[in-house]
């Protein structure tokens, strides 16, 4: 199992507003190797909020295929559009990991 986490720091009050954007569904569910998406709000003591958008894939190759797909482009096409409001996103970092052990 391969997990990709997008660690996103947003302005306070925006994590819960933004979370549904990542789990509204779309073409990603039909892609080979896709398992699920979870969005976590990370508890920290500072002025911003941290979200971890976690996607589970069968293999890293499956994830890489997603990033090169038309479905990926469609899912990300509106995020760079200019609006009258400034973006609530302060920073983001992608972390890739292979699951080595699990207890259910």
UniProtKB/Swiss-Prot annotation:
Task: Supply the InterPro entries for this chain.
Answer: ABM_dom (IPR007138), Dimeric_a/b-barrel (IPR011008), Heme-degrading_MO (IPR050404), IsdG (IPR023953)
Q: Name one GO biological process term.
A: heme catabolic process
Q: Where is this site: Transition state stabilizer?
A: 66
- Report domain ABM positions: 2-94
Say yes or no: keyword Transit peptide present.
no
TM regions (residue ranges):
none
One Pfam annotation reads ABM
Per UniProt, subunit arrangement is:
Homodimer.
Cited function: Allows bacterial pathogens to use the host heme as an iron source. Catalyzes the oxidative degradation of the heme macrocyclic porphyrin ring to the oxo-bilirubin chromophore staphylobilin (a mixture of the linear tetrapyrroles 5-oxo-delta-bilirubin and 15-oxo-beta-bilirubin) in the presence of a suitable electron donor such as ascorbate or NADPH--cytochrome P450 reductase, with subsequent release of free iron.
Q: What is this protein called?
A: Heme oxygenase (staphylobilin-producing)
Q: What is the scientific name of the source organism?
A: Staphylococcus haemolyticus (strain JCSC1435)
| Gene field | isdG
